Swiss-Prot record:
Lineage: Bacteria, Pseudomonadati, Pseudomonadota, Gammaproteobacteria, Alteromonadales
InterPro entries: SlyX
Protein name (Swiss-Prot/TrEMBL): Protein SlyX homolog
PANTHER family in alphabetical order: PROTEIN SLYX
Family: Belongs to the SlyX family.
Organism of provenance: Shewanella pealeana (strain ATCC 700345 / ANG-SQ1)
Family annotation (Pfam families): SlyX
Length: 70
């Protein structure tokens, strides 16, 4: 009977440890999810600002004349 009690106690300790680990992982997932949402918002803002910028007076790469050594 003592062996069975030891096995049950060991299983209970493992479950308690796993519960703590799951809670820590859940906390990290929540933090990362919030960080991702914030970064997505920032990217959305940057993209809207980028699209709003007027094109520059510089010629595009395809319109540039090649340098003299070509």
């Amino acid at each position: 009977m003592d062996n069975l009690e030891n096995r049950v106690e060991e299983l209970e300790m493992k479950i308690a440890f796993q519960d703590g680990t799951i809670e820590e992982l859940n906390t990290q997932v929540i933090k990362l999810n919030n960080l991702l949402a914030s970064q997505q918002d920032q990217l959305r803002i940057l993209l809207s600002k980028l699209h709003a910028v007027e094109p520059s007076n510089m010629a595009s790469q395809s319109e540039e004349t090649p340098p003299p050594h070509y």
